From Swiss-Prot:
GO BP field: fatty acid biosynthetic process; long-chain fatty acid import into cell
Alphabetically ordered keywords of this record: ATP-binding, Fatty acid metabolism, Ligase, Lipid metabolism, Nucleotide-binding
One GO MF term: long-chain fatty acid transmembrane transporter activity
Catalytic EC class: ligase
InterPro entries registered for this protein in UniProt: AMP-bd_C (IPR025110), AMP-bd_C_sf (IPR045851), AMP-binding_CS (IPR020845), AMP-dep_synth/lig_dom (IPR000873), ANL_N_sf (IPR042099)
Gene behind this protein: fadD17
Full protein name: Medium/long-chain-fatty-acid--CoA ligase FadD17
SUPFAM superfamilies documented for this protein: Acetyl-CoA synthetase-like
Catalysed reactions, as listed in the record: a medium-chain fatty acid + ATP + CoA = a medium-chain fatty acyl-CoA + AMP + diphosphate; a long-chain fatty acid + ATP + CoA = a long-chain fatty acyl-CoA + AMP + diphosphate
Role according to the record: Catalyzes the activation of medium/long-chain fatty acids as acyl-coenzyme A (acyl-CoA), which are then transferred to the multifunctional polyketide synthase (PKS) type III for further chain extension.
Family note: Belongs to the ATP-dependent AMP-binding enzyme family.
Tagged with keyword Ligase: yes
Cellular component aspect of the GO annotation: plasma membrane
Pathway: Lipid metabolism; fatty acid biosynthesis
């Protein structure tokens, strides 16, 4: 295989595999039959698509064999799937469909309710089953794709505004699958457990692509379930799993049993896990967990090493620097700035139909991640939030993530989100939303005493207000919707406690 593999190159061997394939609920489909399903989908869609327009097809599906077969169809035919987020509804979802130039939308029954009258094909319907049956004997052929050719459009989470459609090439997807396969020594005897949503880059690049690259099997779950995670791993013999965000925390919150480590899981890979969860998860379930740092765009990637301090993203790689957003100069040790790839775009291939956003991301010929971080004297990086999270408090720029890490030490806190609300005079005030352990009552004096005892929390970093929530609003990929919390402000339906002296 060439240094830059493509998705078709990974798919070709699967067409001959009859003893490994897709596990889903109580069913099993061999790779050979799965590739045949992909060929039928490709043929059916080609009949319906206008060849003079981009062959873009919106996909609004849970993690089902059809979604995986649709990805196979894309690799075989050049049809471009566009992952649609079920959290988006009505006009917002219609905007995403139009923005990506989707000629049609495929949805399953479980997801179709979010379309609110938008025209679509229900892939669970008898009519669609007849269409696929009519193409069951379609020729299994694979396009001769170039590594740089577009494979899929994947929308960003849109936590700070309208999501952007990230271009994902064949090489971007295939290299991720091959890299993970080699890193963890995966092969034909392995089973990859994929429960993260396939409309998101994490599930496609380090879930689906890994299963395809290693030529083992894949176990799909419609939606992630913490309570069913371990039973699924045992049921399907899963040896590898991926995650994004909080799933490790949710699994760790399930009741611990003495036989938790009695399972086939060997390796877990993901990003944006809670600091410390990787070690706790690996110890409890007897597996290796690697947490990386990156985004759908792929312009900056940081990997933890065995000697990485707790809470750190890992050592700054060559050409990844922390720069002052205003001056463009390198930040000194301990100062918060933007993570920038000074060597160029990395794996960023642009946003579809948004030249302005693409140009802004590559302003000055370097890749601007929009992520804030700081480094210690040894060169290890620490996440400090997003540029949109930057707070201007009493004339000083503050990142949200360092404050969140401190507040998570509070004995009664299990989830924390820090965000800015307008200061009545000028700038911002710090506000924190907290979820407490079951049965805990918020004690404002106890909390103030806790803050006073934290040597790494400055006076300006103290929250002006704390909101006590039953749950934090999140996206389908478990990212906190801070813009929603900020919009609520202090006049919300939850208890809000003033903390910092406002005088």
């Amino acid at each position: 295989m060439s240094a830059d593999p493509t998705v078709p190159q990974l798919l070709v061997p699967l067409a001959e595999i009859g003893d490994r394939g897709i596990y889903f609920e109580d069913s099993f489909t061999s790779w050979a039959d799965h590739i045949g399903h992909g060929a039928a989908i490709a043929a059916a869609l080609r009949e319906r698509l206008d060849p003079t327009r981009p062959p873009h097809v919106g996909v609004l599906l849970q993690n089902t064999p059809f979604f995986s077969a649709m990805l196979a169809a894309a690799g075989m035919s050049g049809i471009i799937p566009v992952g649609l987020n079920p959290v988006r509804r009505g006009a917002a979802l219609a905007r995403d469909i139009e923005h990506a130039d989707c000629q049609m939308v495929l949805a399953d029954t479980a997801s179709a309710s979010t379309l609110d009258g938008i025209e679509h094909v229900n892939v669970d319907s008898a009519e669609w089953a007849e269409v696929i049956d009519a193409h069951r004997n379609s020729e299994i052929s694979f396009q001769n794709a170039a590594p740089a050719d577009l494979f899929m459009l994947i929308y960003t989470s849109g936590t700070s505004g309208d999501p952007k459609a990230v271009k994902c090439s064949h090489s971007k997807v295939a290299i991720a699958g091959v890299t993970m396969t080699q890193r963890f020594g995966l092969g034909r005897d392995d089973v990859c457990y994929v429960s993260m949503p396939l409309f998101h880059s994490n599930a496609v690049l380090v879930g689906w692509a890994v299963a395809v690259a290693c030529q083992g099997s894949m176990a799909l779950r419609r939606k992630f379930s913490a309570s069913q995670f371990l039973s699924d791993v045992r049921r399907y013999g899963a040896t590898y799993a991926n995650y994004v965000g909080k799933p490790l925390s949710y699994v760790l919150a399930t009741p611990e049993r003495p036989d938790d480590a009695d399972n086939p899981l060997r390796a877990v890979y993901g990003n944006e896990g809670v600091p410390g969860d990787s070690e706790r998860f690996g110890c409890r379930f007897g597996c290796v967990v690697q947490d990386g740092f990156g985004s759908t765009e792929g312009g900056v990637a940081i990997a933890r090493t065995p000697d990485t301090p707790a809470g750190s993203l890992g050592p700054l790689p060559e050409n990844i620097e922390i720069l002052d957003p205003e001056t463009g100069q390198q930040c000194p040790v301990g100062a918060v700035g933007e993570l920038v790839n000074t060597a160029g775009p990395g794996r960023f291939e642009g946003y579809y139909n948004d030249e302005a956003a693409s140009a802004q991301r590559m302003s000055g010929g370097v890749y601007h991640s929009g992520d804030l971080a700081y480094r210690d004297a040894a060169g290890y990086a620490y996440f400090a939030g997003r540029l949109g999270d930057w707070m201007r408090v009493d004339g000083e720029n503050l990142g949200t993530a360092p404050i969140e890490r401190v507040l998570l030490r509070y004995p009664d806190a299990i989830e924390v989100a820090v965000y800015a609300i307008p200061d009545p005079v000028v700038g911002d005030q710090v506000m924190a939303a907290m979820v407490l352990t079951p049965g805990a009552k918020f004690d404002v004096d106890k909390f103030r005493a806790f803050l006073a005892g934290q040597s790494d929390l400055g006076p300006k970093q103290w929250p002006s207000y704390v909101r006590i929530c039953s749950a934090l609003p999140r996206t389908e990929t478990f990212k906190v919707l801070k813009r929603q919390l900020a919009a609520d402000g202090v006049d919300c339906g939850d208890p809000v406690w003033p903390i910092r002296d406002q005088s």
